[in-house]
């Protein structure tokens, strides 16, 4: 849709084609929703100097013809403001602010619950140079070693099912969080599911769960953008 030069710095694993950050997937889906494409640049946890120009230390970082925007939520607002003729990320709602609660819920509630399940798999996806940093930061946060986490995985999956209850209840009544068409609210949550899909073959929802059908719909959006994305582990049943 636009001839502007967009560059997106995304978290990558040892295989640089595997881009697994949930926050980067929020942005990747938002770009596709707007009909935009960006050159993806692989970035790793220890490559902080490569995004020093953004004056912060995490991804996603979007560069639009010399303008730098970091943080997936700020990027969404930037895209909504600077590409007003493209489809709105707010869907049928009155504005992007309507997605704010879902974005916060995904980051503050869903992500921590899912992290306890996925961190051992994430560790193996990482480039070796990132593993020491990842181990130290995550073990300090969780209060146990990465190797201890699988012992409690079934408990974590049970808790994750409980955490997903509001999402499940909503999707029983409508195909997308925004109603009959997807919005940035859907992408905020879907980013978490892409994180799981890219790094692990663990089934976090059952086939008869309304969330499963919703995830399938999101995977098929934009000519299968997310479904075609390279993954580290993928079972036949997830294809």
Residue ranges and their predicted role:
Residues 1-132:
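GST-like domain detector, emphasizing the conserved glutathione-binding G-site
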Residues 106-213:
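GST-like fold's C-terminal all-alpha helical module
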């Amino acid at each position: 849709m636009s001839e502007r030069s967009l560059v997106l710095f995304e978290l990558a694993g040892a295989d640089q084609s595997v881009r697994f950050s949930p926050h980067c997937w929020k942005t990747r889906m938002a770009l596709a929703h707007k009909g935009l494409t960006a050159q993806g640049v692989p970035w790793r946890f220890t490559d902080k100097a490569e995004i020093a120009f953004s004056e912060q230390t995490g991804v996603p970082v979007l560069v639009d013809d010399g303008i730098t925007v970091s943080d997936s939520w700020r990027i969404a607002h930037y895209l909504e403001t600077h590409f007003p003729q493209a489809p709105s990320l707010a869907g049928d709602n009155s504005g992007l602010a309507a997605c704010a609660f879902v974005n916060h819920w995904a980051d503050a509630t869903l992500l921590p619950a899912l992290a306890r399940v996925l961190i051992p798999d994430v560790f193996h996806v990482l480039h070796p140079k990132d593993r020491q940093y990842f181990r130290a930061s995550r073990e300090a946060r969780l209060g146990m070693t990465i190797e201890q986490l699988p012992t409690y995985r079934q408990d974590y999956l049970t808790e994750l099912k409980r955490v997903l209850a509001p999402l499940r209840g909503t999707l029983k009544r409508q195909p997308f969080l925004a109603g009959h068409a997807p919005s940035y609210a859907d992408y905020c949550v879907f980013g978490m599911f892409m994180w799981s899909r890219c790094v692990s073959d663990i089934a976090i929802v059952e086939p008869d769960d309304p969330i499963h059908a919703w995830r399938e719909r999101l995977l098929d959006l934009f000519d299968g953008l997310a479904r075609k994305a390279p993954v580290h582990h993928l079972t036949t049943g997830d294809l």
